[in-house]
């Protein structure tokens, strides 16, 4: 079984989030039991399931989808 990308979710707060190809999404403002909440420029908010986090290098969180899929998680 593969180890989760993030072991301590509180450490991702205020870190940058990027899509799988490195495009910036915004910064992580909060997390709950199943999602991370990402705020981007232009006051856009995204609620992204933690299952889509593929890596965390200590300063960047990498998601497992391309920029084109980001709007699926946008809060209206």
Please report, for each region that a protein language model flagged, where it lies by residue.
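Peripheral interaction segments used for macromolecular assembly
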Residues: 1-76
């Amino acid at each position: 079984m593969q180890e989760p990308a993030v072991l301590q979710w509180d450490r991702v707060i205020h870190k940058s989030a990027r899509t799988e190809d490195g495009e910036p999404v915004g910064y992580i403002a909060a997390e709950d039991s199943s999602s991370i909440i990402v705020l981007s420029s232009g006051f856009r908010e995204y609620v992204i399931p933690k299952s889509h986090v593929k890596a965390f290098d200590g300063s960047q969180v990498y998601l497992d989808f391309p920029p084109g899929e980001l709007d699926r998680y946008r809060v209206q």
